[in-house]
């Protein structure tokens, strides 16, 4: 199991603290964010381990505890860029280029992930489910989403925007998952999710929040974990059958690619 680094060198890497000078020309908030990012032990570990982002360790830690990913399972990663979660899922499902078990989807271009093809399109496009099923060779056992809306600094607004992404991801998962499948998605603390929780509890046998050690202590970030999908006979998604008006292209962003003031990576 991956443990939270106690210090920057706990992963076997000798790291020197880096300080960004106040006269660097950056705004103070940007300077603080950059300094924290550079000195983050998960960022340093991700470089040493070959992961594209520190967010990879969030999925590793959640999977170590909750056992979502197993060899041969089919997985869809929504908003896959830059590819850290695809890397983890591909390794744990034993996905290969010849026999892919993991497919990512994102309208943002990204480098190819070995063993995990990525479709360059919006997952809300009408033909996305069919194209994903074709790429996987069937419906998924797991749907993942680490999407978050770029933050505005207004906590209530940020929560609502990211919750909307979580809701449309959940509706997508309900439309494609195999019975017994699992759904994992980023959300923020802050309420306004009773309808989503009610819908998930109606359609999955286990629903709860998780916060992996790789999520910063001060972050409002949480993950919704819904396990053991009951199947589509349990009832249609509530309130999510209609496509929102162009919100995903305005809001969707893999949080680990954001800069100062944005969601945690």
UniProtKB/Swiss-Prot annotation:
One of its GO terms (cellular component) is cytoplasm. The active site is at residue 186. It comes from the Bacteria. Residues 230-265 are annotated as: Disordered. Keywords: Cytoplasm, Methyltransferase, rRNA processing, S-adenosyl-L-methionine, Transferase. One of its GO terms (molecular function) is rRNA (uridine-2'-O-)-methyltransferase activity. It is found in: Cytoplasm. Its main location: cytoplasm. Its EC number is 2.1.1.166. InterPro entries: RNA_methyltr_RlmE, RNA_MeTrfase_FtsJ_dom, rRNA-MeTfrase_E, SAM-dependent_MTases_sf. Belongs to the class I-like SAM-binding methyltransferase superfamily. RNA methyltransferase RlmE family. This is Ribosomal RNA large subunit methyltransferase E. It comes from Mesorhizobium japonicum (strain LMG 29417 / CECT 9101 / MAFF 303099) (Mesorhizobium loti (strain MAFF 303099)).
